[in-house]
From Swiss-Prot:
<dbReference type="GO" id="GO:0003735">
    <property type="term" value="F:structural constituent of ribosome"/>
</dbReference>
<dbReference type="GO" id="GO:0006412">
    <property type="term" value="P:translation"/>
</dbReference>
<keyword id="KW-0687">Ribonucleoprotein</keyword>
<dbReference type="InterPro" id="IPR018261">
    <property type="entry name" value="Ribosomal_bL27_CS"/>
</dbReference>
<comment type="similarity">
    <text>Belongs to the bacterial ribosomal protein bL27 family.</text>
</comment>
<protein>
    <recommendedName>
        <fullName>Large ribosomal subunit protein bL27</fullName>
    </recommendedName>
</protein>
<dbReference type="Pfam" id="PF01016">
    <property type="entry name" value="Ribosomal_L27"/>
</dbReference>
<feature type="propeptide">
    <location>
        <begin position="1"/>
        <end position="9"/>
    </location>
</feature>
<dbReference type="InterPro" id="IPR001684">
    <property type="entry name" value="Ribosomal_bL27"/>
</dbReference>
<dbReference type="GO" id="GO:0022625">
    <property type="term" value="C:cytosolic large ribosomal subunit"/>
</dbReference>
<keyword id="KW-0689">Ribosomal protein</keyword>
């Protein structure tokens, strides 16, 4: 008599998990308003971590170091000493902005 030894295996291979494969969402940091751009009071100028750019005239700093305009005007980025920068907002007539 003929004996058969039949052995069945799984047709899906077991796969181990990886410890990689995760990342945090981008925080969308950076300059939001360009030099010479007209802004309204409350507009965000720069989103940053730490004070890479310091607040200048008519610019406030939020709790997360975000710089924002305190008045309507034109944005100006300036040097503050040798290695620092500051953002300022200077008032301007609305007619001058519309003419441009």
């Amino acid at each position: 008599m003929l004996k058969m030894n039949l052995q069945l295996f799984a047709h899906k291979k077991g796969v181990g998990s990886s410890k990689n494969g995760r990342d945090s969402e981008a925080k969308r940091l950076g300059v939001k308003c360009a030099d010479g751009q007209f802004v309204l009071a409350g507009n965000i100028l720069v989103r940053q971590r730490g004070t890479k750019i310091h607040p200048g005239a008519n610019v406030g700093k939020g709790g997360d170091d975000t710089l924002f305009a305190k008045i309507d005007g034109v944005v100006k980025y300036e040097r503050l000493g040798r290695d620092k920068k500051k953002a300022s907002v200077y008032p301007v007539n609305v007619e001058e902005v519309i003419a441009e």
